[in-house]
């Protein structure tokens, strides 16, 4: 048996295909989903989900959201998402470097909001680099 996996962002459907396995970045850690999984509703962290279709793994950068698992259907509603095979790795790495610089600057300021925004921007940039196949320091 396979899973029906849908990744839906406000502006588009990022993925809608069968898969054998899904690994999600839940707020409590990595969560693996196989056929026959118990019903589940979970919040998702900004990070990389992985979808196994056949022998291939496809990474998808998720920018937070929710996942529902029921009757071998995995529905993922996210703020934004991007398939790893469609991310320009060099651009993603440049965005990650810029986000690191922005975080360093924010840590020097007194603005709590600037720090929070910089951390979120760094998480998004890290997810994009990882989905594109790059390696980043954590």
UniProtKB/Swiss-Prot annotation:
Gene Ontology terms, MF aspect: ATP binding; proton-transporting ATP synthase activity, rotational mechanism
Localization of this protein: Cellular thylakoid membrane
Disulfide linkage: none
Superkingdom of source: Bacteria
Keywords, in A-Z order: ATP synthesis, CF(1), Hydrogen ion transport, Ion transport, Membrane, Thylakoid, Transport
A cellular-component GO term for this protein: plasma membrane-derived thylakoid membrane
Membrane association type: Peripheral membrane protein
Primary localization class, coarse: membrane
Function comment: Produces ATP from ADP in the presence of a proton gradient across the membrane.
HAMAP family assigned: ATP_synth_epsil_bac
Protein family membership: Belongs to the ATPase epsilon chain family.
SUBUNIT field: F-type ATPases have 2 components, CF(1) - the catalytic core - and CF(0) - the membrane proton channel. CF(1) has five subunits: alpha(3), beta(3), gamma(1), delta(1), epsilon(1). CF(0) has three main subunits: a, b and c.
Entries under NCBIfam families matching the protein: ATP_synt_epsi (TIGR01216)
The protein, known as: ATP synthase epsilon chain
Upper classification of the organism: Bacteria, Bacillati, Cyanobacteriota, Cyanophyceae, Gomontiellales
């Amino acid at each position: 048996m396979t899973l029906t996996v849908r990744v839906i962002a406000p502006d588009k459907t990022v993925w809608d295909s069968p898969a054998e396995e899904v690994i999600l970045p839940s707020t409590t850690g990595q969560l693996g989903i196989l056929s026959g999984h118990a019903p589940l509703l979970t919040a998702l962290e900004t990070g990389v989900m992985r979808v196994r279709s056949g022998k291939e793994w496809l990474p998808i950068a998720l920018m937070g959201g929710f996942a529902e698992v029921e009757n071998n259907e995995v529905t993922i509603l996210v703020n934004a998402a991007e398939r790893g095979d469609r991310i320009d790795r060099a651009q993603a790495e440049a965005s990650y470097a810029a986000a690191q610089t922005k975080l360093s600057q924010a840590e020097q300021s007194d603005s709590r909001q600037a720090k929070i925004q910089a951390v979120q921007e760094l998480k998004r940039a890290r997810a994009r680099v990882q989905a594109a196949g790059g390696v980043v320091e954590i």
